[in-house]
Amino acid sequence: MKMVAPWTRFYSHSCCLCCHVRTGTILLGVWYLIINAVVLLILLSALADPNQYHFSGSELGGEFEFMDDANMCIAIAISLLMILICAMATYGAYKQHAAWIIPFFCYQIFDFALNTLVAITVLVYPNSIQEYIRQLPPSFPYRDDIMSVNPTCLVLIILLFIGILLTLKGYLISCVWSCYRYINGRNSSDVLVYVTSNDTTVLLPPYDDATAVPSTAKEPPPPYVSA
């Protein structure tokens, strides 16, 4: 039998050094659920009252609208899908249904891949940052201050920020995956114990039945008498 050290067991089943991976997955799912619910409320209010979030072309520095109705509907659909995925992950971690966590885990992988592509783009094309900042509207907060920063320092700052963000996202992915493995392992062990207990009950009869003399046993032959 393989022995596992207590600290190894605690590390593999814990996150943030303070809570279980199952609890951490539930909290992470609730956090994402709240964020997407707030985004959905903002989008619905903007769809109900377009003038509240309307920006003219002069404010945006171009001849285009901030967001039309088609893009608004797509954003609302994405928010609803994210709410469903986060709710499934929260419910799956709470009720210990490992399959319900898979969609949220796939979303984390997709988000991590997108951020990695952004980091690679910044690293390969550092001048694209300056071009992107120039395209921002003049009323954008701290636009002039960002433009005045040394381009090399700006690239390093952005890469450092993306690196920290990727590290955090990678750790959260490992926590969700550990929760999935924990629930799968626990369900498998419960099934194994159930099957083993049933087999033991069938194979081992009660002690009284095993030691009792059956009523159909043959009587011993009569004693031998010599002639």
From Swiss-Prot:
Main location: membrane
Cellular component, GO annotation: cell projection; early endosome; endosome; late endosome membrane; lysosomal membrane; lysosome; multivesicular body membrane; multivesicular body, internal vesicle
Residues annotated as transmembrane: 26-46, 72-92, 100-120, 153-173
Record's keyword terms, sorted: Cell membrane, Cell projection, Endosome, Lysosome, Membrane, Transmembrane, Transmembrane helix, Transport, Ubl conjugation
Stretch list, region Required for NEDD4 interaction: 205-222
InterPro entries noted in UniProt: LAPTM4/5 (IPR004687), LAPTM_transporter (IPR051115)
Cross-referenced Pfam families: Mtp
Annotated compartments: Endomembrane system; Late endosome membrane; Cell membrane; Cell projection
Lipid bilayer topology: Multi-pass membrane protein
UniProt-recorded Gene Ontology molecular function terms: ceramide binding; kinase binding; phosphatidylinositol bisphosphate binding; ubiquitin protein ligase binding
Signal peptide: none
One of the GO biological process terms: negative regulation of lysosomal protein catabolic process
Post-translational modification: Undergoes proteolytic cleavage following delivery to the lysosomes. Ubiquitinated by NEDD4.
Family annotation (PANTHER family): LYSOSOMAL-ASSOCIATED TRANSMEMBRANE PROTEIN (PTHR12479), LYSOSOMAL-ASSOCIATED TRANSMEMBRANE PROTEIN 4B (PTHR12479:SF6)
Function: Required for optimal lysosomal function. Blocks EGF-stimulated EGFR intraluminal sorting and degradation. Conversely by binding with the phosphatidylinositol 4,5-bisphosphate, regulates its PIP5K1C interaction, inhibits HGS ubiquitination and relieves LAPTM4B inhibition of EGFR degradation. Recruits SLC3A2 and SLC7A5 (the Leu transporter) to the lysosome, promoting entry of leucine and other essential amino acid (EAA) into the lysosome, stimulating activation of proton-transporting vacuolar (V)-ATPase protein pump (V-ATPase) and hence mTORC1 activation.
Family: Belongs to the LAPTM4/LAPTM5 transporter family.
Subunit structure: Homooligomer; upon reaching the lysosomes. Interacts with MCOLN1. Interacts with NEDD4; may play a role in the lysosomal sorting of LAPTM4B; enhances HGS association with NEDD4; mediates inhibition of EGFR degradation. Interacts with PIP5K1C; promotes SNX5 association with LAPTM4B; kinase activity of PIP5K1C is required; interaction is regulated by phosphatidylinositol 4,5-bisphosphate generated by PIP5K1C. Interacts with HGS; promotes HGS ubiquitination. Interacts with SNX5.
Protein name in UniProt: Lysosomal-associated transmembrane protein 4B
